Regions:
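Residues immediately within or flanking Cys/His clusters that coordinate Zn2+
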Residues: 38-40, 53, 76
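Short Fe-S-cluster ligation motifs
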Residues: 72-81, 108-119
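Short linker/helix segments within small regulatory modules
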Residues: 60-74
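Histidine-centered catalytic micro-motifs
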Residues: 54-62, 80-86
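Short, charged surface segments at domain edges that flank catalytic/cofactor-binding sites
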Residues: 2-43, 67-69
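Short, cysteine/histidine-rich loop/knuckle motifs that typically chelate Zn2+
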Residues: 43-44, 81
Length: 119
């Protein structure tokens, strides 16, 4: 993700924190399926050796839940197709309702547990 100076520029400190958060989400994902050399989309279970075609998605929205922005447990790995599918299906409604992600992920237990603990 590249940041350009402008109305969305947050400064380099935020960029470093975001990259660190993203890396932690991906590393946590590797252990989730017991295949330490693969990253896996939690929706479709496609395995990838690199993160190029994968996104780290916030469970609790970046905009609405500022205190959870950099919590590594507040993220799941989705492939580009599944990530775009989630946002196409729920649009801005998902910003306030993290439970919609659980619905989209067919009741993912880890995500459901994190939401329950942090509401």
């Amino acid at each position: 993700m590249r940041f350009k100076k402008g109305n969305r520029w947050r400064g380099s400190k935020g960029q470093i924190r975001y990259k660190t958060w993203r890396k932690m989400v991906f590393e946590r994902n590797k252990g989730r399926v017991g295949l330490s050399k693969y990253y896996v989309c939690v929706k479709c279970n496609k395995k990838r050796k690199t993160t190029r075609v994968l996104h780290a998605h916030h469970i609790f929205s970046w905009n609405k839940f500022k205190s959870k922005r950099y919590d590594s447990k507040n993220g799941v790995v989705l492939c580009v197709k599944c990530h775009n599918g989630f946002h196409r299906k729920y649009k801005f409604e998902a910003l306030d309702k993290p439970d919609l992600l659980v619905e989209y992920l067919n009741g993912d237990k880890a995500v459901k547990s994190y939401i329950r603990e942090n509401k």
